[in-house]
């Protein structure tokens, strides 16, 4: 959040349009982008025009169907997710805190429009899709896409598969972000 707030204060010298600030992240970065969006709303700024969440972890305290069914053999395992969660919050008992698990926020109303991309064979798929549903229910404009045949991390491998390249450059991400921050 502090980096985003700093960027907003430095937008003019950097030649940025403060009406078109967006946050984006994949995996843990998607979790952080969701959290930054929540903090920006709760703290009265900076105003964000868009959030892009690519296979985000949104519930470190839960156990979704995809987490159970895809817990092994799909690049990202449930054991790895638990370990990442422990590194993130330690043994503080904060896994259910909405700033750690955005899906558990009491309200998502007033957040910026979002693109949420999930991967078919990702243990985090269901919680990412549940977050998109909660955003939509809160009146937030959402583009939500499940990338069929994809594993967690595919956006970091755009040349590994034509599907990843298409998702990033054309279908979901490029079009949504262009509408939000460029046009």
Regions inferred by a protein language model and the residue ranges of each:
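Alpha/beta-hydrolase superfamily serine-hydrolase fold, recognizing
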Residues: 1-183
């Amino acid at each position: 959040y502090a980096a985003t707030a700093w960027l907003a204060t430095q937008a003019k010298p950097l030649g940025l349009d403060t009406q078109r600030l967006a946050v984006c992240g994949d995996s843990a970065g998607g979790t952080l982008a969701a959290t930054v969006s929540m903090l920006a709303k709760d703290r009265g700024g900076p105003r964000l025009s868009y959030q892009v969440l690519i296979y985000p972890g949104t519930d470190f305290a839960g156990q979704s169907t995809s987490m159970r069914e895809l817990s092994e053999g799909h690049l990202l395992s449930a054991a790895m997710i638990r370990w990442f969660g422990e590194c993130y919050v330690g043994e503080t008992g904060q896994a259910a805190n909405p700033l750690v698990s955005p899906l558990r926020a009491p309200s998502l109303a007033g957040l910026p429009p979002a693109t949420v991309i999930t991967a078919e064979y990702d243990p985090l798929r269901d919680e990412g899709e549940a977050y998109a549903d909660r955003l939509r229910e809160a009146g937030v404009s959402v583009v939500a896409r499940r990338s069929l045949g994809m594993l967690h991390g595919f956006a970091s491998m755009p040349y590994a598969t034509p599907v990843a390249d298409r998702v990033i450059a054309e279908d979901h991400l490029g079009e949504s972000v262009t509408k939000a921050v460029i046009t």
